[in-house]
Amino acid sequence: MADFFQNGEISNLHRLKPGDAKRLEKELEGFSQKRPIALVLPALFQDLTAKPIKNILSEIAKVNYLNEIVVTLGRTKKEEFAEVKAMFASFNLPVAIIWNDGENIRELYSILEKEGVSAGGDGKGRSAWIAYGYILARGKSDVIVLHDCDIVTYNRELLARLCYPVANPNLDYEFCKGYYARVTNRLHGRVTRLFVTPLIRALKRIIGRIDFLEYLDSFRYILAGEFSMRADLARINRIPGDWGLEVGVLAEIYRNCSLRRICQVDIADNYEHKHQPLSEVDPNTGLNKMSIDIAKTIFRTMAGMGVIFPSGWVKTLKATYLRTAQDFIAKYGHDSEIDGLAFDRHQESVSVETFVKGIELACDEFERDPFGAPQISNWNRVTSAIPNFFDRLKSAVENDNT
């Protein structure tokens, strides 16, 4: 049974009545008449040939409140794109497929580069960003919802609960982030459990109360990739192009929204998707790289807000983080014991030791370059630099889909 505790700086919308999808869907059908909903599905070709996608599409096909679906494909060859088009050809909802590796879209990326509003390199951030642009160019949806295509435990209730807070005009939220537990026979979500939350708590102890850190600490699953937002936010939000995507998006939401317009919603009893390796010896891949990118995003965002990091802060942060994370390991060990879950204390400790090294690398990079790679520009800047870009984007996607 879910709790009903309200903690932190944002509203928590709990799942107190599971199995209520039909009521939610009926209400969403009404809300969508005034606030049409677009669903964005960022995917690699391998996601669309893996086992979970069949169930995901089967569940999506049963809903009647979506106005449009945008599948934004990364790392996809020509013959693979043709296969994906065939997959969606008979789908019962309007589907546009953005082929990010195709000639038409690559030409647009080149134009952006020449005009000084680069969309950065290939990745989920750029794929999501171009999908938002296409939705804005069409101008037919007021709500944008995004989730991944590798969710093993997907069902219609997850989608409905994700859409509902922003689609419902009576609630008046502009941004909603999903949260959930990630449990099989053991606890998952190592980067959230053992890195991000302990890092935020360590920073709070060192630097003191910072509103931005209090805000981040309010999210129950800060790295969840599922969210909904008003389409207007897609015009003004910038997007990171690396593993700092989720935290970077939250930073932009913090910058552009009132806290009263931000919420998080419990979307599932449990959530399972593909797992990333820790990669403890290689900081350029896996959870190791993810932790470094996330830390840099947090440090750079704080610096941009005027936070001054004290002298000697790196050593203090590493020590404080390590102690905090070790305390978290003990808590999760107790959690696992009472619930009869497997718990490998050694592997949990290896993860934390890897993340400590990642913090040092992130701090070094931050001090060397406090700005980092520029974020992907917001769409207002793009259309200011290239007034007819939306028309070009619509034409490119439509040409690829014919």
Write out the residue ranges for each language-model feature.
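Short, flexible, basic/aromatic active-site loop/helix in glycosyltransferases
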Residues: N170, E174-R182, T192-F219
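Short beta-strand-to-loop acidic/aromatic patch adjacent to the donor-nucleotide binding site
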Residues: R138-V152
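N-proximal low-complexity "stem/linker" segments adjacent to membrane-targeting elements
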Residues: M1-K62
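Aromatic-glycine-rich donor-binding/catalytic loop that engages nucleotide-sugar donors
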Residues: G139, R205-Y221, G225-W243, N256
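Conserved donor-nucleotide/metal-binding helix-loop-beta segment in metal-dependent transferases, i.e.
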Residues: V152-A181
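Active-site-proximal specificity loops/subdomain of glycosyltransferases
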Residues: D20, K78-K140
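Catalytic donor-sugar/metal-binding loop of nucleotide-sugar-dependent glycosyltransferases
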Residues: G241, A251-N270
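Terminal low-complexity segments of carbohydrate-biosynthetic enzymes
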Residues: M1-K17, N92, Y271, P277-T402
